[in-house]
């Protein structure tokens, strides 16, 4: 199997294609991407027969920025007979995957696919029963086995394949289902909440998003991101010339500092989190983030990089490479991840976690 399907935000197919082509080549997997504008997905086709399997096994899904999901597929099933769509799908999956732990019948995230989504929901139950009977699925859901994907691109027209549960998005269609909290000051709050779900394993939340931590929000007004930190009982310094929502100030957990986020320097050395969602050139934001990390002013950071109109993948890659180079130069070991989240628009969200510094005596090590 030489094809891989990647879901992405509609309008960002070219970026997703450029990224998978680049990162596949680093694994010595060569091929080409099929791109249809505003379709919400990309198909990468390798030149060697087992290239698809190699990518979903060896290319870390967490290293992809523009992909929401990644799975290997066989040939496109066309013109499924309306009276029996199940038999051809079961036949295609037999021999491709054994004892999958979960079934996801999905569509791309487009307006055109909304009607098709209703069909997928109804179709899932009888298809799951048939796949269990055929041995393609286990008799119970388990996260330890591969996920079986059936991806409809049109009525009666689908790709079938699988992903590995330790190297995929755990979410249906690659989208976390989050509800906007009615008391949050702005919808941007969902970006940070989604970032926590994507970048921080659920079993580490109690330790890394803990009560009583100190956090800084640069460019905080009106407080959408501060809201998420307050909700987790952190003490937050919100830095912005613009006013904060009164509901946040009333909690007593927020200190509003009326100054420019680029000029602010912290006066304490135990800041666990710095978050930043400022509308500014990505290179300028990347330089500021690198400064915070190199100086040990925070342990972890989540920030947004606004994307230019063209060469978006190249721009983000340069920004991340700059941050990595600064960390390397100063002997700081860190994990860097970036993803265009479902709640992001013309931007990507980056998470950096300092692990240790080669040189002792930084502010966060005293």
Curated annotation (Swiss-Prot):
Q: What is its EC number?
A: 2.1.1.186
Catalytic site: 306 (proton acceptor)
Query: Which transformation does this protein catalyse, written as a reaction?
Result: cytidine(2498) in 23S rRNA + S-adenosyl-L-methionine = 2'-O-methylcytidine(2498) in 23S rRNA + S-adenosyl-L-homocysteine + H(+)
**Where is the protein localized?**
Cytoplasm
**GO biological processes:** methylation; rRNA processing
Report the top EC class in one word: transferase
Give the protein's recorded name: Ribosomal RNA large subunit methyltransferase M
Task: Give the binding site residues for S-adenosyl-L-methionine.
Answer: 188, 221-224, 240, 260, 277
Subunit text: Monomer.
- Do the record's keywords include Methyltransferase? yes
What is any one of the record's Gene Ontology cellular component terms? cytoplasm
Q: Which family does it belong to?
A: Belongs to the class I-like SAM-binding methyltransferase superfamily. RNA methyltransferase RlmE family. RlmM subfamily.
Q: Entry's Gene3D superfamilies? A: 3.30.2300.20, 3.30.70.2810, Vaccinia Virus protein VP39
The record's section on HAMAP family has:
23SrRNA_methyltr_M (MF_01551)
Function, as annotated:
Catalyzes the 2'-O-methylation at nucleotide C2498 in 23S rRNA.
GO molecular function annotation: S-adenosylmethionine-dependent methyltransferase activity
UniProt xrefs under PANTHER family: RIBOSOMAL RNA LARGE SUBUNIT METHYLTRANSFERASE M (PTHR37524), RIBOSOMAL RNA METHYLTRANSFERASE FTSJ DOMAIN-CONTAINING PROTEIN (PTHR37524:SF2)
User: Mind telling me which SUPFAM superfamilies this protein's record contains?
Assistant: S-adenosyl-L-methionine-dependent methyltransferases (SSF53335)
What keywords would UniProt list here? Cytoplasm, Methyltransferase, rRNA processing, S-adenosyl-L-methionine, Transferase
């Amino acid at each position: 199997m030489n094809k891989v399907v990647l879901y992405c935000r509609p309008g960002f197919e070219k970026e997703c294609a450029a990224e998978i082509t680049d990162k596949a080549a680093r694994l010595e997997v060569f091929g080409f991407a099929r791109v249809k504008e505003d379709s919400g997905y990309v198909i990468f086709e390798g030149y060697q027969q087992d290239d698809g399997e190699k990518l979903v096994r060896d290319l870390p899904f967490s290293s992809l920025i523009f992909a929401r999901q990644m799975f290997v597929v066989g040939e496109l099933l066309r013109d499924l007979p309306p009276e029996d769509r199940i038999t051809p799908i079961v036949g295609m999956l037999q021999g491709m995957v054994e004892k999958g732990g979960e079934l996801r019948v999905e569509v791309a995230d487009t307006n055109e696919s909304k009607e098709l989504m209703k069909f997928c929901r109804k179709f899932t139950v009888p298809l799951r029963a048939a796949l269990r009977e055929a041995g393609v699925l286990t008799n119970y859901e388990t996260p330890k086995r591969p996920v079986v994907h059936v991806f409809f691109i049109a009525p009666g027209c689908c790709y079938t394949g699988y992903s590995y549960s330790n190297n995929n998005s755990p979410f249906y269609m690659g989208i976390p289902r989050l509800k906007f909290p009615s008391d949050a000051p702005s919808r941007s709050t969902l970006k940070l909440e989604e970032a926590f779900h994507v970048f921080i394993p659920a079993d580490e939340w109690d330790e890394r998003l803990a009560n009583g931590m100190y956090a800084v929000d640069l460019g905080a007004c009106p407080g959408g991101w501060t809201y998420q930190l307050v909700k987790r009982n952190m003490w937050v310094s919100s830095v912005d010339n613009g006013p904060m929502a009164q509901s946040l100030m009333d909690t007593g957990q927020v200190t509003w500092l009326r100054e420019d986020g680029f000029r602010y320097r912290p006066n304490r050395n135990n800041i666990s989190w710095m978050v930043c969602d400022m509308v500014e050139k990505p290179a300028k934001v990347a330089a500021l983030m690198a400064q915070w990390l190199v100086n040990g002013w925070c342990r972890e950071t989540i920030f947004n990089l606004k994307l230019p109109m063209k060469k978006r993948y190249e721009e983000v890659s340069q920004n991340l490479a700059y941050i990595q180079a600064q960390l390397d130069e100063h002997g700081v070991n860190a994990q860097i991840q970036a993803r265009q989240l479902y709640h992001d628009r013309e931007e990507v969200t980056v998470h950096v976690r300092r692990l240790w510094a080669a040189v002792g005596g930084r502010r966060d090590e005293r």
